[in-house]
């Protein structure tokens, strides 16, 4: 058995059950374990929105129970500069970004990794993500988590082999019910705490209200695919492709009663374009163009290849053909048309269990490009 007693691991403690159990499992494996709670957002409103104080208290309670030290660090400035401003710029441009992916890239596996190594003397960091690391080839690879329902590799595709080499993912080999069972057996404060669903580090506040504070809303009209004005929107940023609820339009006189879906955004005209029916052709794409590529092995792809892709979290794998257009642009053609492919979101590629990397969806296409 490996002697881990001289190896120091700093666990990112979020105040949730996954990071709590991660710390315990590493302790059981003999590592020197300490926790780190990251504060990445300055509270600017009432406690009902912001759970940071509760999360910190929960993280502290778990560390006390396990007998490990908890450090705290404030990355609010880094979060604002490297995550939030880009997040706002993307929304302003009419796209729908994924801040959790950016947060993992810039905060958890960059700012945290550097702070843990340089200030706390860590050999590794660890998080409660449901992914696995494979070292069998000599270059650390990122694998999907064992629990298919909880696999979070989609959110970690920007990591390099080098970052993975410095990271441990203790719950990646477990299923969520097992993790909760361990927490309950230990009597951890986080055992029954529900999973967070809010934007990374900003909590579960009302999103439209939150976004409206930072970006002035620009109301405009809602048009059908035929150009008929049928309503008004409060701002393109509040809508995403494939959205059905919250449009404020019902059936039209002399029209069918099928629900309306967002099928496009005309940013130049500030017009939201809708169509009726979940199978309307305008909802579907034959493929996409992606840029800002991050391959885990950091090797530029120059030859076409086949694999599977996800264009959003928890989506079924889509067989596809990937054709590099230049070093930072790829054309992806789906085996069958896909609904609601959304610019600003990430396309993430897999070969079997391995996450190869991904990129940001620049545009979607139908027919040939």
Curated annotation (Swiss-Prot):
Describe the function of this protein.
Catalyzes the 2-thiolation of uridine at the wobble position (U34) of tRNA, leading to the formation of s(2)U34.
This one is known as: tRNA-specific 2-thiouridylase MnmA
Amino acids binding ATP: 12-19, 38, 128
What EC class is this?
transferase
Where found? Cytoplasm
Q: Which reaction does it catalyse?
A: S-sulfanyl-L-cysteinyl-[protein] + uridine(34) in tRNA + AH2 + ATP = 2-thiouridine(34) in tRNA + L-cysteinyl-[protein] + A + AMP + diphosphate + H(+)
The gene from which this protein is expressed is: mnmA
- What EC designation does it have? 2.8.1.13
In this chain, the stretch annotated as Interaction with tRNA covers: 150-152, 312-313
> Sorted alphabetically, which keywords does the UniProt record give?
ATP-binding, Cytoplasm, Disulfide bond, Nucleotide-binding, RNA-binding, Transferase, tRNA processing, tRNA-binding
Disulfide pairings: 103-200
The answer on whether this UniProt entry bears the keyword RNA-binding reads yes
């Amino acid at each position: 058995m490996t002697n881990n007693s001289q190896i120091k691991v700093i666990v990112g403690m979020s105040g949730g059950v996954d990071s709590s159990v991660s710390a315990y499992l590493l302790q059981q494996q003999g590592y020197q374990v300490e926790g780190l709670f990251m504060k990445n957002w300055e509270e600017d409103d009432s406690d009902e929105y912001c759970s940071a104080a509760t999360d910190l208290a929960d993280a502290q309670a778990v560390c006390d129970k396990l007998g490990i030290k908890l450090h705290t660090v404030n990355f609010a400035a880094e979060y604002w500069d490297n995550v939030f401003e880009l997040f706002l710029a993307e929304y302003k441009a009419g796209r729908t970004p994924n801040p959790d992916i950016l947060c993992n890239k810039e905060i958890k596996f960059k700012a945290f990794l550097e702070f843990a190594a340089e200030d706390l003397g860590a050999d590794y960091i660890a998080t409660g993500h449901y992914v696995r690391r494979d070292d069998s080839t000599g270059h650390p690879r990122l694998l999907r988590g064992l629990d298919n329902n909880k696999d979070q590799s989609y959110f970690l595709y920007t990591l390099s082999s080098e970052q993975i080499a410095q990271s441990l993912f203790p719950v990646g080999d477990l299923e969520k019910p097992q993790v909760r069972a361990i927490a309950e057996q230990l009597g951890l404060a986080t055992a029954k705490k529900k999973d967070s669903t809010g934007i990374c580090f900003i909590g579960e506040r009302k999103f439209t209200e939150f976004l409206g504070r930072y970006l002035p809303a620009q109301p405009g009209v809602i048009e059908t695919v035929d150009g008929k004005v049928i309503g008004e929107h409060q701002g393109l940023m509040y809508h995403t492709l494939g959205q059905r609820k919250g449009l404020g339009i019902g059936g039209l006189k002399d029209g069918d009663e099928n629900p309306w879906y967002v099928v496009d955004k005309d940013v130049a005209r500030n017009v939201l374009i809708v169509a009726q029916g979940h199978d309307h052709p305008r909802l579907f794409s034959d493929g996409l163009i992606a840029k800002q590529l991050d391959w885990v092995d950091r090797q530029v792809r120059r030859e076409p290849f086949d694999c599977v892709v996800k264009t959003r979290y928890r989506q079924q794998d889509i067989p596809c053909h990937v054709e590099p257009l230049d070093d930072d642009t790829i054309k992806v053609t789906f085996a069958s048309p896909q609904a609601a492919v959304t610019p600003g979101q990430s396309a993430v590629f897999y070969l079997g269990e391995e996450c190869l990397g991904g990129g940001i969806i620049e545009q979607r296409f139908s027919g040939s490009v």
